UniProtKB/Swiss-Prot annotation:
Source species: Arabidopsis thaliana
Family named by the database record: Belongs to the eukaryotic release factor 1 family.
Entry-linked PANTHER family: PEPTIDE CHAIN RELEASE FACTOR SUBUNIT 1
NCBIfam families to which the protein is assigned, alphabetical: aRF1_eRF1
Subcellular compartments: Cytoplasm
Entry GO CC: plastid
Keyword Cytoplasm applies: yes
Protein name, UniProt field: Eukaryotic peptide chain release factor subunit 1-1
Keywords: Cytoplasm, Growth regulation, Protein biosynthesis
Function per UniProt: Directs the termination of nascent peptide synthesis (translation) in response to the termination codons UAA, UAG and UGA. Modulates plant growth and development.
Length: 436
């Protein structure tokens, strides 16, 4: 899987997390909220028939208000299903019903989408809340890890994804042992031995590239690599010039195992369990660590804070955009009705409570809000336009927590140095409003 696909997957996961949050918070009156999940290869006709039967049953509900809202929800589910001739390859998720919003007003909602990977659940429930349990399995990691188990008798290449392990290839090798005989030939024996070892390490390095680099994208097809084995072959491999640098960057751990082959593979999996469970955590620490390194070395290739980061983004200078996954800032597009000028502001909860932020500077004229969207959502939709990678981080690691508290939860690693003061003079007014 290329890095771009990883990016896309992380953003899909963030979107699902956000959706689950909003669905779980929604409540309705009576049992008028439908949760419908169809796995891949299910039949639309089966579900359409089932909804028809449900409609008949719901017509007998005694309470008129509840009956009408349940029938309304079933009808909107039927209408939405008409848009699909067949179930999409990854299945179909549909939520529809009448929810009660914060003001106590009723609002109809319908959400339907194809998950970003196959969903192995079949569900139909009519309740006073949406059921999202099945969506949680989409968040579970399907990362694939590569294992190279190397000792004096041979090498095994394998992968582990979830609980599925697979042996890709293994080969054995016959290396000469160290011995004290030979007299004058001792040097020659030692040289032959070193040569054979060198060839063995080279063969392993070449096969590693063959099995763990995707030729189509020229990127590793695994999220991380574990090198295992007895003796020091594994260390020799990891430090060798012959080992592909793209794979060297993916090494998560080097472990000592007492066996070679499949037994060694199993042992390596056990010894690496904790690291594999925390791989997202490790990637996050590395990413923010790299960001902090730019700051501590004062390279000028970093940016933080909402306005500076977005200015750098607009200028195409950001290589990696780093955002806290719970950043609570909204993006407002507002219009000055007197001049027709459009103003964009990014406000946190505190700033939203200040009415001055919704007025034209130095006047009492109110700005018309044309669009309000969470900044996170706007970035998830738009980041590709700016040619950067988007990384969502948590505040669970020490580095993540420091990034959220000390740097406002948004920043970026730049492609080149950028003078941020140039933006201040151009756009001083907006910056005064939005500075945190």
């Amino acid at each position: 899987m290329g890095d771009k696909n990883d990016d896309d997957k992380n953003i899909e996961i963030w979107k699902i997390k956000k959706l689950i949050k909003s669905l779980e918070a929604a409540r309705g009156n009576g049992t008028s909220m439908i949760s419908l999940i169809m796995p891949p290869r299910d039949q639309v006709s089966r579900v359409t028939k089932m909804l028809g039967d449900e409609y008949g049953t719901a017509s007998n509900i005694k309470s008129r208000v509840n009956r009408q809202s349940v029938l309304g929800a079933i009808t909107s589910a039927q209408q939405r299903l008409k848009l699909y001739n067949r179930v999409p390859p990854n299945g179909l998720v549909l939520y529809t019903g009448t929810i009660v919003n914060e003001d106590g007003k009723e609002k109809k909602v319908t959400i339907d989408f194809e998950p970003f990977r196959p969903i192995n659940a079949s569900l139909y429930l009519c309740d006073n809340k949406f059921h999202t349990e099945a969506l949680n399995e989409l968040l579970e990691s399907d990362d694939k890890f590569g294992f190279i188990v190397m000792d004096g008798n041979g090498t095994l290449f394998g992968t582990l994804s979830g609980n599925t392990r697979e042996v890709l290839h293994k080969f054995s090798v016959d290396l000469p042992k160290k011995h004290g005989r030979g007299g004058q030939s001792a040097l020659r024996f030692a040289r032959l031995r070193m040569e054979k070892r060198h060839n063995y390490v080279r063969k392993t390095a070449e096969l590693a590239t063959q099995y763990y680099i995707n030729p189509a994208t020229s990127q590793p097809n695994v999220s991380g690599l574990i090198l295992a084995g007895s003796a020091d072959f594994k260390t020799e491999l990891s430090q060798s010039d012959m080992f592909d640098p793209r794979l060297a960057a993916k090494i998560l751990n080097v472990v000592d195992v007492s066996y070679g082959g499949e037994n060694g593979f199993n042992q390596a999996i056990e010894l690496s369990a904790e690291i594999l469970a925390n791989v997202k955590f490790i990637q996050e620490k590395r990413l923010i660590g790299k960001y902090f390194e730019e700051i501590s070395q004062d390279t000028g290739k970093y940016v933080f804070g909402v306005e500076d980061t977005l200015n750098a983004l607009e200028s195409g200078a950001i290589e990696t955009l780093i955002v806290w996954e719970n950043l609570d800032i909204n993006r407002y597009v507002m219009k000055n009705s007197a001049t027709g000028e459009t103003v964009i502001k990014h406000l946190n909860k505190e700033q939203e409570a200040n009415t001055e932020n919704f007025k034209v500077a130095d006047s009492d004229l109110a700005l018309d809000v044309e669009e309000k969207l969470s900044l996170l959502e706007w970035l998830a939709n738009e980041y590709r336009r700016f040619g950067c990678a988007l990384e969502f981080v948590t505040n669970k690691s020490q580095e993540g927590s420091q990034f959220c508290r000390g740097f406002g939860g948004i920043g970026g690693i730049l492609r080149y140095q950028l003078d941020m003061t140039a933006f201040d003079s151009e756009d001083g007014e907006a910056l005064d409003d939005d500075s945190e």
